[in-house]
Amino acid sequence: ALAGRQLPPANQIYASPLLRCRETASLLFPSQPFEVVEDFRECDFGAFENHTYEELKDDPAYQLWLDTAGEIPPPGGESKAAQKIRTLGAFHSVISRHSAGTIALVVHGGTIMAILESLEPTHEFYRWQAENGCGWLCAWDGRSLTVIFSY
């Protein structure tokens, strides 16, 4: 479904280090190299990583994490606030290298949600729920972000 999708051209592409994002970047921008940005990786879910809801639903630590909407970190993992600080730092680092032009970020849903919530604070984190393969075209003027459209 992503291969052949018509996207605006990008002067530079940045991707999470995880394989699924690197593969997606290659599908979306087949003739362009991309730069891997370590801090664009998804949230570290610690002890919950690679487990399903069914496997975790009776775990009190998991229930507490769900009840707080991820505000407390999973055991051995990263809090939503820590992820937001990390990903927003990476975003500002990438943006600071570009005074003009178009960049593309091929990253995870939680990474997108953290960046968009931070830069468009009229909508909270879960308002930016990102499905697989979705994206936003945004304009950045150095101070604020304007969403032009989503797909």
What kind of feature is each model-predicted range?
Residues A1-Q32:
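Active-site-proximal alpha-helix that buttresses catalytic centers in soluble enzyme cores
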Residues N11, G101-G109:
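Generic beta-sheet signal
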Residues R20-R22, E42-C43, T111-A114:
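Short, active-site-adjacent cap segments at secondary-structure transitions
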Residues L27, A114-S118:
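Active-site signature of alpha/beta-hydrolase-fold catalytic machinery across serine-
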Residues L28-R86, F149:
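Phosphate-handling substructures
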Residues A3-G4, L88-S96:
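Generic structural signal for well-ordered alpha-helical scaffold segments
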Residues T122-T146:
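Domain-level recognition of soluble alpha/beta enzyme cores
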Residues A15-S16, I85, V106-V107:
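Short beta-strand scaffold positions
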